[in-house]
Amino acid sequence: MLRFVCGRFQSGIRRYATTIDRFRNIGIIAHIDAGKTTTTERMLYCAGKIKRIGDVDSGDTVTDFLPQERDRGITIQSAAISFQWHDSSRDNSPRVINLIDTPGHADFIFEVIRSLKVLDGAVLILDGVAGVEAQTEKLWRYSRNIPKICFVNKMDRVGAGFSKTLKELTYKTDRRCVVVNFPYFEQTNQSEDPVFCGVIDVINMKLLKWDTKANSPDAVTVVDLLELNDSDNAKVEAIKSRESMVEILGELDDVFVQEFFDGPSEGNSLKVSAQVLNKSIRKLTIANELTPVLAGASFKNVGIQPLLDGIIQYLPSPLEARLPEVNPKDIPVVHDPKVGALINKQNNLCVALAFKVTHDQIRGLMVFVRIYSGVLNSGNTVMNTTTGEKFRIGKLVIMQADQAQEVKSLSPGQIGVLTGATITNKVATGDTIISHSIKKDGIRSFGEKESQLKVNAIQIPPPVFSVIVEPKSLGNKKLIEDALKEITMEDPSLHVIIDEETGQTVLNGMGQLHLEIAKFRLVNEMKVPVDFGKIAVSYKETLELPTEVVTFKDERGFHFSLSVESFEKDTINIEERSGASCFSVDNDENYLIIEGFQDRLQKSNWAYQIPIRNFVTTILSSAMASLQSAGKVGHLPLYSCAVRLKKDWDFPLDLQSPAELLSITRSLITEALQTVDVSNYTLLEPVMDAHISVPQNDIGTVMQDLCSARTATISSLDDENVSSSDKLMELESQSKHLYYPTDSTLGTAKIQDDKLKTIHAICPLKEMVTYSSKLRSLTKGRGELHMDYKGMSKVSQERIPDILQEL
């Protein structure tokens, strides 16, 4: 046996590799409590980034640095950190991993959504005991276009099952998987059950055993499996897994088949080199045809180095990543083997996405950006293509959690931060920034297409909870407005509505915890003297029938005709094919439709004094202000409606200020809404897609409570046991050739015989706010609830009076 101690970089090394192929932009995603932050902490220690391992429960991890994160033991906001890792199987040069640790709680799903927009790959962490949970499936859907590797964590826990989890993964995600390593258990004198202490490396046919008592990820013993007795169980399982791997790769990769039969291996799966296997797995992973699966126990420091190797081996560099989505769609985006994405055939065009905005008490405003093409230099003039505004940026930094490292420039594939007073109020989350890669003021050399360019648009989920925000005194009103502006700029999934009639300010968010964190920040971090109402469900209204068309026309040249109607965003393509342009108004799926807009842009050079961008922004502002409290049932915001501007619109060519344009269009929208009475308005409420896991003996009680007390609609009832006979055939077709190693501990784990069933139900959110405690009572603590926002639904007539009374 050999003693192997993982080589680690010194924490003082600050110089990063500059070639693009050496970067890995990856995210850590998982269901809450699967071990994301713990895994990240071990990665940083193994890489020499930190000298001491922090602990989530102790509140001293690197990436969970906010006070509320450390108090609650959960990740609230995404944290970015860069570090080097040397994969011993490749050349001697280190790779740079730009890692983003994301939240797992459903209330902070927007943090995950915006992070996924800038990542080239992801590590999906699975709880080896819980398996593939509801939030895991949701994260898989969000990241379906991103190459991933899976890490089955917590294999040291009683009831953990690697193959059980692997079966769930292949069944629930419909993705082909390949086992790169799997758990190794050893019988000890201290325990009746086998103890997890290492992994079996299928690629290199090695057994890696960690000394778990040493409490260090570095103390690893390496055993050559081929030197063991043929009857040794570890060797037998490894050979079966390698044969399975070769069959899977042979089915998906023709080049591998040729190398397998014509190369040195001569058709023997044990003779295929690690290099050939890794090359094929990498190719298929980047093509999103295969997902490598690894095992470990992060808290016990087991399996971290192979996971880091897997990130380098299998996940793409920016040169290999999928091309960004660009609008307008006629702007060409091609792959350049040297620089990655080349946008609009412009070698010197730097394109960056601002995916996160935050305020630091010391550094001020910080804008996190991902560079897609070109080079962004400190001190350069840039343009925000959303607003059309040009401004000079200050210092550029790379973040190491809450520590900043200043750099002179950011290259393609890098994730960095804009800082300085010059960017204040200039950039919001989701904005695209363009610049010239060489000239400081070269932005002037770009044309109209570049100035309209948008990259990887970020969709903001609609908020479903709200809370009233009131100043403690009238003198504090401006302070509160500024604080709310700051907090919503950082987190656009928070939304502020001000009722112009009552003056009431309402803060909307994704969940109760989401709003609790926002309240904490306003009071404790921003020191705003404010009172809050009770957190409540956010209701909306919509139109049943379109309003009448109303018109404004005068001798000065103003001519606008418009109406308001219910609208489904799925019909946007139909509108655009007819020559109209559709613009999102807000987070409530409201839209502005400008008929004939595309023809206007094509047939003329836009002779108006007011720029195109300002014209659209003005009409959008009118729509937003008019719709936010226009409902007649409960004076609520309108949802899923469209303001349709008829194609004969016009205004004076020499009009320079948009103020009159704003006033006219806003009055018109209000007038249009007055043409229909209250009977044309419908009250809407958020409904949730609930996944409720309950013991079989409690199904009847729980379903009766859901249908009667919660007015839920039951969609289906599923068996959580993937191995049940009715699922075996489907699982077999999805996991063809995949070998499932023996789950050594499941036979001895103290698991109750009462199998769990999953109830899928559509439920009004209002009826589910306190349901978790009720479910625990009905199931003696064994029931589990997970909910996803499904959409807005009409409120039944019998429930409307109670809801209006609550409002």
From Swiss-Prot:
PROSITE patterns, per database record: G_TR_1 (PS00301), G_TR_2 (PS51722)
CC annotations in GO: mitochondrion
Domain tr-type G: from-to ranges: 21-319
Residues reported to bind GTP: 30-37, 101-105, 153-156
Gene3D superfamilies: 3.30.70.240, Elongation Factor G (Translational Gtpase), domain 3, P-loop containing nucleotide triphosphate hydrolases, Translation factors
InterPro entries (alphabetical): EF-G-like_DII, EFG2, EFG_II, EFG_III, EFG_III/V, EFG_V, EFG_V-like, G_TR_CS
GO molecular-function terms, A-Z: GTP binding; GTPase activity
Alphabetical UniProt keywords: GTP-binding, Mitochondrion, Nucleotide-binding, Protein biosynthesis
Swiss-Prot/TrEMBL GO biological process terms: mitochondrial genome maintenance; mitochondrial translation; regulation of mitochondrial membrane potential; ribosome disassembly
Cellular compartment(s): Mitochondrion
Pfam families associated with the record: EF-G_D2 (PF22042), EFG_C (PF00679), EFG_III (PF14492), GTP_EFTU (PF00009)
UniProt xrefs under CDD domains: EF-G, EFG_III, EFG_mtEFG_C
Family per record: Belongs to the TRAFAC class translation factor GTPase superfamily. Classic translation factor GTPase family. EF-G/EF-2 subfamily.
Function: Mitochondrial GTPase that mediates the disassembly of ribosomes from messenger RNA at the termination of mitochondrial protein biosynthesis. Not involved in the GTP-dependent ribosomal translocation step during translation elongation.
Additional comment: This protein may be expected to contain an N-terminal transit peptide but none has been predicted.
Designated name of the protein: Ribosome-releasing factor 2, mitochondrial
Lineage start: Eukaryota, Fungi, Dikarya, Ascomycota, Saccharomycotina
Gene that encodes it: MEF2
